Amino acid sequence: VYVPQGSDWSVTADTDLELAVCSAPGLGGGVPVRVIAPKDLGQEVRGKGTNTRYVTNILPEGKPADSLLVVEVITPGGHTSSYPPHKHDQDNLPAESYLEETYYHRLNPPQGFAFQRVYTDADRTGARSLDETMAIEDGDVVLVPKGYHPCAACHGYDLYYLNVMA
């Protein structure tokens, strides 16, 4: 369900559920409330070889969402995603757009782990303003304020992430 800024809403569940509330400051674009049905979700395969991953576009670029982009990605064990590395920290369309990004990670089986590196380009001295490599466990959230952000799923552990950008 897409709910624009300033709207009142609530959720009532009859069974246990895992609910993701993805939000960002809106631009006041007047986008109406709407149900995003499974038939409306675009699915695609990105990458080749060990860079193959499976993407479900929930709120993709080009669909009205008042500055919010949401995708789900499944990266099979032994594969990488958000790779080759790319970034969203400059307003330089069409090559790059300025976006902050979060990753909500799940693993199957859940006792597994993956890796994610968030880093910037090196300056003339070789220093980076951001360079963090994290062991990701089931349920972890990673904030990407700037820089590149590739993920690697270890063999035997499929990596799912909900990717939210604004």
Please describe what each predicted stretch is.
Residues 1, 72-76, 95-129, 135, ...:
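Short, conserved beta-strand element in jelly-roll/cupin
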Residues 1-8, 12-14, 24, 135-156:
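Conserved metal-binding segment of the jelly-roll/cupin
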Residues 6-8, 16-19, 67-72, 100-102, ...:
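Extracellular structured ligand-interaction cores
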Residues 11-13, 20, 30-31, 83-84, ...:
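Short helix/loop capping segments that flank catalytic or ligand/cofactor-binding pockets
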Residues 16-77:
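Surface-exposed beta-loop interaction hotspot
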Residues 23, 156-166:
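Short, compositionally biased
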Residues 25-28, 86, 165-166:
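Short edge-strand/loop segments of extracellular domains
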Residues 58-66, 81-85, 92-98, 104-110:
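Active-site environment of non-heme Fe oxygenases that use a 2-His-1-carboxylate facial triad
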